[in-house]
Amino acid sequence: MAHKKGVGSSKNGRESQSKRLGVKLFGGEVAKAGNIIVRQRGTVHHPGENVGIGKDHTLYALVDGVVTFRRGKENRSFVSVKEVVAEA
């Protein structure tokens, strides 16, 4: 009878929590200064005009405006925020 009995719960519970990465504001959406646009690991998307980058590579808006995505050299993805000028 060389076998283990029920071990169950002590062998379970190893799945890590999701990190909620991805694009938070898509192209054409309005961003306020400080809004997170993309949460990512590494620079999948690079910061363009009016976009800052955090130490964890999070991209965020530096000004109020509309989010745009474009492809640059070597097929790199750049995220920019086009400032919307208020008409007086």
UniProtKB/Swiss-Prot annotation:
For biological process, the GO terms are: translation
A Pfam family assignment: Ribosomal_L27
- Give the family from UniProt: Belongs to the bacterial ribosomal protein bL27 family.
Q: Signal sequence span per UniProt?
A: none
Q: Which domain of life is it from?
A: Bacteria
SUPFAM superfamilies reported in the protein's UniProt record: Ribosomal L27 protein-like (SSF110324)
Q: Which GO terms describe its cellular component?
A: cytosolic large ribosomal subunit
Q: Which InterPro entries match?
A: Ribosomal_bL27 (IPR001684), Ribosomal_bL27_CS (IPR018261)
Can you name this protein?
A: Large ribosomal subunit protein bL27
Q: Name any one GO molecular function.
A: structural constituent of ribosome
